Regions:
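A charged, aromatic-enriched C-terminal amphipathic alpha-helix characteristic of glycosyltransferases
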Residues: 36-39, 272-319
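Conserved catalytic-core segment of nucleotide-activated headgroup transferases in glycan assembly
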Residues: 31, 124-127, 141-199
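Donor nucleotide-sugar binding/catalytic pocket of nucleotide-sugar-dependent glycosyltransferases
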Residues: 113-123, 130-145
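Extended catalytic core of nucleotide-activated donor transferases of GT-like folds
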Residues: 40-124
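N-terminal pre-catalytic "stem/leader" segment of glycosyltransferase-like enzymes
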Residues: 1-77, 312-323
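Aromatic "clamp/platform" in nucleotide-sugar-dependent glycosyltransferases that forms part
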Residues: 217
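Short alpha-helical segment that forms part of, or immediately flanks, the ligand-binding pocket
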Residues: 203, 226-230, 249-251
Length: 323
């Protein structure tokens, strides 16, 4: 199996400046955090290792020598520039934000299949690339993310804040009433702001907290949420629905809906709410469930999203589309 993955890191100010910039970033910020695409790729590789699947990473020379081999391109589309034009490609996940970025791709390349992480993303991509899009989520490390004893719980609620677009509006309509309610109940609260924490911080809080408030407008998969679910942490999840609202595309270019912030979910995971209007009522239901230990969020992840299961499904896709 030939896997291809690289983080995009183009030159910015002058040729080859990406190399000193990388060194400086590491010195100032520490090692690169495995979020999003990188975390998904690392989890795929871990899953392949666990099931004993054979693979090579970024073997461009080997692919040139065997142009009929399937190139499994994982990550952003800049990698396609390094893949021979005649090579068949299994493309995804974590690719274009929207196929409008290159609607003619299936005519330019031998794209055997495009992989996206959830059903709503599949429906959106199929509007531009019909007939070649399949759902494949990456797995979660359920041996690493495990529940901690109740005695270790010194935080009641972690607020996971991934609100970026229309920030001021949602601060007034969502964050302020949420924090007021948490304070009114006397709950011990910690906050993780997306982009400002390290994965080990979330891992540690997963051991310490009783519940998480998950605030994200929409998610293609929601790996961070699923990691906490695997750790036995129930979620109070904001799920507004409606349109996909990436401002690069919405509303002038793309109007697609409905979307969701928790594409892998059932009632064992916690409680969802739509916005400020139902926040307080829904949180009351949620917190009663937390205190009664009525949720079993880990069970959903173990049943549907283990590293081994998702890696096996990926191997099956490679076999199916590589022939």
């Amino acid at each position: 199996m030939k896997l291809f993955y690289e983080e995009p890191d183009p030159d910015r100010w002058f040729p080859f400046d990406r190399f000193p910039r990388k060194v400086i970033r590491t010195m100032v910020r520490g090692a690169t955090q495995p979020r999003g695409t990188m975390r998904a790729f690392l989890n795929l590789v871990d899953g392949l290792d666990r099931i004993g699947a054979s693979y090579r990473i970024n073997d461009y020379r080997g692919l040139r020598d065997d142009s009929g081999a399937l190139a499994c391109v994982f990550g952003k589309p800049h990698i396609l520039d390094k893949i021979p034009r005649q090579s068949p490609v299994l493309f995804g996940t974590s690719i274009y934000s929207h196929p409008n970025d290159n609607p003619g791709l299936p005519r330019q390349r031998d794209i055997r299949q495009v992989l996206v992480p959830s059903e709503w993303v599949c429906r959106m991509f199929e509007q531009v690339w019909p007939g070649i899009v399949s759902v494949w989520p990456v797995g979660i490390d359920t041996e690493l993310w495990i529940p901690a004893p109740d005695a270790a719980k010194d935080v009641d609620v972690v607020v996971y804040d991934k609100i970026a677009w229309r920030r001021e509006h949602y601060e007034r309509s969502l964050l302020e009433p949420l924090y007021a309610e948490l304070e009114r109940r006397g709950l011990r609260v910690e906050t993780l702001r997306y982009g400002d924490y390290r994965e080990e911080e979330m891992f540690a809080l997963g051991k310490r907290c009783r519940a998480m408030v998950y605030l994200s407008r929409h998610e293609t998969q929601g790996i961070a949420a699923q990691q906490m679910l695997a750790a036995g942490v129930p979620l109070f999840a904001w799920d507004e629905g409606g349109f996909w609202q990436d401002p690069k595309y919405f509303p002038s270019e793309v109007k697609f809906g409905p979307v969701t912030s928790v594409p892998y979910w059932d009632d064992r995971c916690g409680v969802k709410f739509q916005g400020g209007d139902d926040l307080l009522e829904a949180f009351d239901v949620f917190w009663k469930g937390v205190e009664a230990q009525a949720f079993s969020p880990r069970d959903m992840v173990v049943e549907r999203l283990t590293l081994e299961r998702c890696a096996s499904e990926y191997v099956a896709l490679v076999r199916r589309f590589g022939t």
